[in-house]
Amino acid sequence: MTLSQEKINNMAACLPVVGLLLLVAALPFHYGCAQRFALYWLAVTYPLDYVLNHRWSHWHWTPAKWIYVAFIAFFCLVPVWQLFDPIRTPLFDFTIEQYAPFLAVGLCGIAGITDKFQIDYAAWTMLGVSTAIVICLIVRTGLHHPDFAHWVLCFNINRAEHINTHMVVNLYFNLSLILGIFVVLYEKRSVIVRIITALYMVPSIFALLITEGRTGLLTFLLCTFVFLLHYMLVRRRWWMLSVVAAFVVLAGGIIMNNERLELIGKTTNPRIYIWKVAVETIMEKPVLGYGVCSAREEFVRRGLADKEFNEHYADYVRTFPKYTAQGRVHFEIMHPHNALLETWMQFGVFGVFLLVICLILPSLMRLGKYQLFLDLCILAFVMQACFESLGNNLQPMYLCLMVLLFQNQYQSDVYLQKLKRQASEHPVAEITPTA
């Protein structure tokens, strides 16, 4: 291979990395041109890299790739069930687009991606975007407020208006912190880089502590507790028992003094009535489900006939300008606020089985030092899935991308170790120069 060919191949290998970083940077914002551009970029550069660098030459099947088969199978439920769905609404096209990561990442995961991508690239990108979001919100909110509580309220309102819902942004913050911890503890970087990475984590922690989203805050506390507990037990750092105990006390104080969490015992969560209607809908067709479009139609029909559902959910939709246009109320935006229930409504027990497989298999991949952090990412996603539906404020790309990045990083490490071992066992013979 000539020097120019090598440069071209290296450039081709780096182009998908640019697309992945653009995609990672665009995730906390509303789905639009930024994410689409990143996906189009990957659609062009991924096959270019795959062909020029002969990625197939090192391909081999591993048990870890079964997760990508599950991703593809889960995506295929959408078009297959539509064949038997008597109606088709714009929700079908929306669902296809939102579930596309299961198909795209599934295919890329099986085939393999560029070895140029590193977890710390994603970590720094996510932490940088998170820091920029928090700084922009602080500037927009200003400092002239009567008290801190009012400032926090304005901060969260600005985030909802200019960035995205608390469910989307808080999950992004939590995942960025998980990747940041990995870089600080395990990446072979200088002390300065680790300190800077740790400092970049502070804005995300601050935003999670003042968020109005209970799920985001509880996810942050739970993931931190699991990490500390795992580090203490697996690494046998028994001195950390005092750290874990102190964190439990601190977390308890945060929970007890959070206004939104205090409301749990005083008010009824609207999701209780939403889930009740969802379960009633499921019980009509528990085995096969309705399909994407019919499931939503039946859910909305039953909900509008339910007094408590109307009082705690539908009335909010009726009065919110975002959901009223062209002289009618867009009730079709109402959803079960639970990924498992919505999947069950749509695809029956087949969908539930595949969704559970997609959430369990990543924890069985045996990725060495990467496994704990992938498990924490899955835990954060599952926490969100308990209170949100896939494709609404719970983007499948979060799950698919984390699985792909950690598994690819692990495979790259294994391959490099294999090359080093072969080099040590079979040293290159001295080459006699020729005239």
Region roles according to the model:
Residues 21-28, 197-212, 380-386:
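Membrane-interface alpha helices of multi-pass inner-membrane proteins
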Residues 41-46, 355, 374-386, 390-430, ...:
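Transmembrane alpha-helices of multi-pass inner-membrane enzymes
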Residues 120-152, 163-232, 252-256, 402, ...:
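Alpha-helical transmembrane segments of multi-pass inner-membrane proteins
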Residues 206, 211, 231-269, 275-284, ...:
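A membrane-periplasm/extracellular boundary helix in multi-pass inner-membrane enzymes
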Residues 238, 346-379:
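Hydrophobic transmembrane alpha-helices and their immediate junctions
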Residues 294-339, 343-345:
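Interfacial juxtamembrane loops and adjacent helix segments
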